Amino acid sequence: MDQYWREQEGRGLFEDDANSYVSDDDTMSSLTRMIYDKNSSRDALHSDYDSSSFNVDSSSVAYPAWNQAGEEAPVTMEGVQEILLDLTNKLGFQKDNMRNIFDYVMVLLDSRASRMSPSSALLTIHADVIGGEHANFSKWYFASHFNDGHAIGFHDMSSPIVETMTLKEAEQAWRDQMAAFSPHRMMVQVCLYFLCWGEANNVRFVPECLCFIFECAYDYYISSEAKDVDAALPKEFYLDSVITPIYRFIHAQLFEILDGKYVRRERDHSQIIGYDDINQLFWSYKGLQEIMCADKTPLLDLPPFMRYRHLSDVEWKSCFYKSYYEYRSWFHNVTNFSRIWVMHISAYWYYSAYNSPNLYTKNYHIRLNNKPPASCRWTACGLAGAIASFITLAAVVFEYIHVPRRYHSARRLWPSMLLLISTLLLNIAPVVFIFASSTKEQHYASRLVVGIVHFFFSLVCVVYYSITPLRNLVGFTTKRSGKNLANRFFTANFTPTSKTGAFVSWCLWITVLVAKFLESYFFLTLNLADSIRFLGAMRPYDCRDYILGAGLCKAQPKILLSLLYLTDLSLFFLDTYLWYILISTIYSLAYAFCLGISVWTPWRELFYRVPRRIYTKLLYTDDMEIVFKPKVLISQVWNAIIISMYREHLISRTQIQELLYHQVPSEKAGYHTLRAPNFFYSQQVKHYKQDLFPANSEAARRISFFAQSLAESIPKTSSIDAMPTFTVLVPHYSEKILLSLREIIREEDQLSRVTLLEYLKQLYPVEWRNFVDDTKLLADENDSVIGSIDNEKNGVNKAYDLPFYCVGFKSATPEYTLRTRIWASLRTQTLYRTINGFSNYSRAIKLLYRTETPELVEWTNGDPVRLDEELDLMANRKFRFCVSMQRYAKFTKEEAENAEFLLRAYPDLQIAYMDEDPQSRHNDERHLYSVLIDGHCPIMENGKRRPKYRIRLSGNPILGDGKSDNQNMSIPYIRGEYVQMIDANQDNYLEECLKIRSILAEFEQLTPPLHSPYSVNAKAADNHPVAILGAREYIFSENTGMLGDVAAGKEQTFGTLFARILSLIGGKLHYGHPDFINVLFMITRGGVSKAQKGLHVNEDIYAGMIALQRGGRIKHCDYYQCGKGRDLGFGSILNFTTKIGTGMAEQMLSREYFNLGTQLPFDRFLSFFYAHAGFHVNNMVIMFSLQLLMLVIINLGAMYTVVPVCRYRQFDSLTASLYPEGCYQLKPVLEWLKRCILSIFIVFGIAFVPLAVCELGERGAIRMVIRLAKQIFSLSPIFEIFTCQIYAQSLIANLTFGGARYIGTSRGFATVRVPFSLLYSRFSGPSLYFGSRLMYMLLFGSITAWLPHYIYFWITLTALCISPFLYNPHQFAWTDFFVDYREFMRWLFRENSRNQANSWIGNCQLCRTRVTGYKRKIYGKKADKIAMDSPRARITTMFYGEILGPLGTLFFTCIPFLFINSQPGNDDETQSTNAFIRLIIMSVAPLVLSAIIAFFFFCLGIMLRPILGDRSKTYGVYLAGVAHFLFVCVDVVVFEVLGYLEGWSFSKTLLGFVAIISIHRFAHKFFIICFLSREFRHDGANLAWWSGRWNGQGFGYMVLTQPWREFVCKTTELNMFAGDFLLSHLLLFLQAPVILIPYIDKLHSIILFWLVPSRQIRPPIYTIRQNKLRRQIVLRYATLYFSLFIAFFVLLILPFVFGKSAAGTSMDKFNLIQPATKIVYSSTKNSSV
């Protein structure tokens, strides 16, 4: 298209049909100017740019729908050019921006004009961008101008009723005046908006700011100032004076200059004025009034035409402020999801209060089971209303904290607070009134009436606060009201769901809630009633501690009861998600049947109808001329699909002959007919299919889905010529473009056992065989060898074939090696695979265009070259492919060659990248450019391609996490009305691309509008635009093993099953790829993603939230799918899980969640919560419940150990006596525990239901059973448990510390054994510590109060501890195990004399810096750590997770230890033991000893430093090693001493060990938070501590304080090292039985990779020297391993078998030794009242 401009030299500037209107009143508004612009004469202003600056295609085929339409275009192409030239010259835009926007606008006009008249095309585009009902500019205009007496919008209108206009009247006036615009004026406004947008760089993320800039620019453009030659704006004024100052403010919020370099500021989101804060300043007129120039003059005080020039004078730093504080706090969830907490906690209170009457019954006696007065029971339940009011009041208070009052659109909170305080007091008053009455008064009828009224009033409060959005608690704003327009337009403009969708939504949630509340009552709370009755009345007798006395141990039943309540409440939250999953799965399946998406369609019927459906659903259009019989057209499409599969080596030469349409002689002489493949018509289609396609092959899957998808309801399509233009956009950073031959045929590293090519041949044997046959055929043709196929069959030439089957070629020429590289690249996650797949759109468009336009052959006179040119023109007109290669200018040589190969293979591929001005000096500010090239760009002398466009940027656009910035950089280069967002590891197929017309029809914009968008009729019939269209993904890694299949299953359920029903009920958001985006809707609202660093790490979903809040619809189509790669390694998958979990935590802090959570209607709010945040909250609650259950188990086990337990029959009378006398009735607690375990088991098991249902519906019962059986055999439930913990931990850690970032995950095959040290360091914090702590508790519970149900807990906790090693390839290979053990021991003791990042101490310091942070200034020594770190966490944020949580665990673990040592039943007070002192001594002793050892070796290092000199570095290694090993021995001795003091009772010792761990955990966190300053970025302090060399470490003046800080570090490090040493060896010892199993490595590989033994990966090949060395390593370290194993057994087990208590002997002078446990039955004392 750029050729057009070359022929325009010498043409004059355009003659406008409108004279520019010059207002005498400088305060005239821009709307008035838009309305009253008069015709202007031609401007004689000198141009900075003229038409000779451009190269645009002027041929007649350029933009044919616009230029060659039957109706004359309202503005010609030359006129658009002249408009752009004039705008550029007057407003100071860049030349290349103008050229790019010209093509952008013309392609957009051509796309619209292809299906409607040019006038309608321009009118609808103007309505979409500027003035329409759903245009963002019009909404911004009314939001920011309407609420101030219409002074801005309508001040100068002549109508006398202007001042009293309502919003409805104002909107009508707007529409009337928009309709009166001339086409030229509309084109000016559209072009100006896109010029402003195209050059805005990061300001594109602030759409309302862009609207304001556009308004100022337009005011200036239509003024006389713009025509004044002497006052002309300088070149590139817009970038330098308008955009760059705003960009620099954004940049300054994130970066500061330190030591001459930009480094990221250490600020959390609440301290950063981000894109949204900037944008919200422009939402109101009061905000606009705060925009001040440097001389403190408000910008709005200037005449409108002067504002554009003075934008460069604005002090943006003084204008912008925070409009929402994203404090890292759990309080956001209280506000955002207050209705969830009200609904659950209030309902739980109703249930619990009703079932706990004994707790508020005066003088309750268990034998009498006396009931409270009815009034008390009614009002006790009614207290739920106070709870609901209090929770909602807290939500409003936290809203006050998060939304500053300075923000002009902040709502008034005092009416809500007044209401809530009133209802709170009204709900508390009856409780006080009734319970303060005497027992006699409580039986009065008046009290009963008060109680009943209170109960129903509380019910009203609970229902109201559960259903009503927080922002609508007091008063409602009608749609016609002019109040608070900004919030209504930009945060709560929710599209109403259809009647069907609303009905389904309410039915779904009514079903879920009814099932949940019924099940929760009978299964959870009612079963707790017996436990409440017995524990509430339980009074332990004769128990005491020497120091604490009897008070604490007598409170043990109440403590246990409080844990039961808390655990039951957490489970009460869990089952809501359980029912949501179940019910939504059923609804989704039913909806799928309604849509026709099911494998249950008769198989023969399904394939029999494929030809007919190809014609009716893919080919036939209403305006199609019937020239050939449908069979001819069908055959072209079907043969193209089959041939594409053959070219991809999915089917063989034999199979392709069976599947193609063939031309055969007809019965009539001289005629031919088409014979359809028997595949369609055979009576045994399924048998035929299995013969043609191998079982579970890719070809069978694709054909099956294609046939099934055509059975669905697909929108009617238009012709290819009338199809909208669209773009595929792929962001690329460092993903592999094309595999090199070295990567394919060489092992990845020394830990790899297989080359990539060998592994691919194992995964795709059929496709490899087809590829080899094809290559051999090509080689035979080139070598003129005849009969090679026969020789192969006869086995004559096997030596000739060997190289082909080995590496895919015999001759290592580039064309053959490239074929192998491409074959491998098309089966891995490469960019080449993505481009090859999505280029099928171009092939599909050509195919469809040729079939529907048979006259093409006549037009081209049968010339195949001209025919191809015509097809190429149509494909390029309708489809563009753009890859945003951020690093293209800095590619390595190999990457550059691969990119060049892509451009040569796909010349129409466009690459957008960021370039730097080569002429910039070292001291000058760099000029960065956004550049676009394609395969047609000529290659310059420097080897690079000449850019089509090179637009200077205001600065580096990569300010966030990268991906969204990368997309934003390239978004001006997309073309057309829609864009498909694709990742660089996806694939697509020809048969799916053929559906593109139907997909674009889902946006409901194919038919021309019946009325002008500015007419009243259009307003009445208007529907909200479709903003996003979601699509299915097939995870092509599902057959690569268990982990790949799990990832595929999650995508299958989440991205398909739930997305289907969520789109119907209005709860679907933009999950990512391969969704289609409505370009005009999204780019005018901030783009396709958000980009604030950290906060928007999951950038894709924000596009959905933008669309949902701003009036867009989000749909989902099931009949189209493309391929998607997923991470295949354990660590890589969990990195992705961590990114999703931390991203969700950031979403919870965002204003989008605040807006949606506080404004969505009830049913859509529930869908939004449980489909997104609810999943992660559920994972967190599961793990919290698990921890609570372990605390219940140890507290219950402590009681079971030392008290007599009553016999229990569940159906005995409530007043039955307890037997034997003096016993404690604890059996009901065990019964309740059984049901809780069953509940959690069901919650975990329910995770497989969606996948099972999805498989059942789409692939059949047999495939469902096979797939689930393979997953269960592969131990995938264990992986799911571990994943659940990673989700929960990443969410909690991010809300505590922050640090969310984009995690680049691996996209290769996980065949390499990961070292134990790496796995341990990666997962110890998130899971191993947590799992081991709970496992110790469960071991105690299993010893003291065994239940068979505990087996489930053992599986769960074992999963948390061993999953990283269970899913590590070749983890249990004998030799590799001990070689790895050697590396692990080195890792433990490494970096005590030299800097080594891969070490235990390095990992320990890295974990610690989440709390302490790094020092900002670097002293003397080069930093070892990265410069861009997350900010130091605030102590108030860490209080809950790092202080309060461990403190609670400490309390609930120490209490049972004290109780188990309190000797219940022993009435001899003289025999009381000092259990409390014992616990204190055993807890403090390790801390004191670690401090002594650390200080001793510090002094030793200082003393040895002068003696040894430079050798002190080496000596430091031994000092550190001795100190660490010595403290390991100290920890073992402490455990032995504890066992001795506990009388060698293993259960009591174990419980004491658990309590000590809790104390140490709390102490370590407390010391680190309270006493440690920031870390240095180098490791000098650690090295200096052991070597004594404190000088020269780069401490500066801090050398005086650093030893004291390091002393605290070393005190905690020695404790943590001992814990890690013991825990890691425990985990290694657990693997001992496994590594001794013969052939375990093969069995393990079958589980992981699903490779049969005959196709197992071979063991690595080593040299003789390497084998000898490995045998020596195995001998040494196997000896060490088993020696430590025996030592652990002897020291930690045998003493408890043979030891005897020394209590009461002369050695027990201080009563520290616990006597043997004796359960005492007392016939005179009762444990219950």
Swiss-Prot record:
Give the Gene Ontology MF terms in alphabetical order: 1,3-beta-D-glucan synthase activity
Cite the record's note on assembly: Component of the 1,3-beta-glucan synthase (GS) complex, composed of at least the alternate catalytic subunits bgs1, bgs2, bgs3, and bgs4, and a regulatory subunit chr4.
Keyword Repressor listed? no
Record family assignment? Belongs to the glycosyltransferase 48 family.
* UniProt keyword terms in alphabetical order: Cell cycle, Cell division, Cell membrane, Glycosyltransferase, Membrane, Phosphoprotein, Transferase, Transmembrane, Transmembrane helix
What EC identifiers does the entry list? 2.4.1.34
**General function of this protein:** Alternate catalytic subunit of the 1,3-beta-glucan synthase (GS) complex. Synthesizes 1,3-beta-glucan, a major structural component of the fungal cell wall. Required for the assembly of the division septum and maintenance of cell polarity.
Q: Does the keyword Transmembrane apply?
A: yes
User: GO terms for biological process?
Assistant: (1->3)-beta-D-glucan biosynthetic process; conjugation with cellular fusion; fungal-type cell wall (1->3)-beta-D-glucan biosynthetic process; fungal-type cell wall biogenesis; fungal-type cell wall polysaccharide biosynthetic process; mitotic division septum assembly; primary cell septum biogenesis
Residues modified as Phosphoserine = S23, S784, S788
Query: Which Cys-Cys disulfides exist here?
Result: none
According to UniProt, the name of this protein is 1,3-beta-glucan synthase component bgs1
List all membrane-crossing ranges: 378-398, 416-436, 448-468, 503-523, 546-566, 577-597, 1180-1200, 1237-1257, 1337-1357, 1440-1460, 1484-1504, 1515-1535, 1550-1572, 1678-1698
Question: Could you tell me what reaction this enzyme catalyses?
Answer: [(1->3)-beta-D-glucosyl](n) + UDP-alpha-D-glucose = [(1->3)-beta-D-glucosyl](n+1) + UDP + H(+)
* Record-level GO cellular component terms: 1,3-beta-D-glucan synthase complex; cell cortex of cell tip; cell cortex of growing cell tip; cell division site; cell tip; cleavage furrow; division septum; fungal-type cell wall
Protein topology in the membrane: Multi-pass membrane protein
* InterPro entries (alphabetical): FKS1-like_dom1, FKS1-like_dom2, Glyco_trans_48_dom
Cell compartment(s), UniProt:
Cell membrane; Cell septum
Name the Pfam families on file: FKS1_dom1, FKS1_dom2, Glucan_synthase
Source organism (scientific name):
Schizosaccharomyces pombe (strain 972 / ATCC 24843)
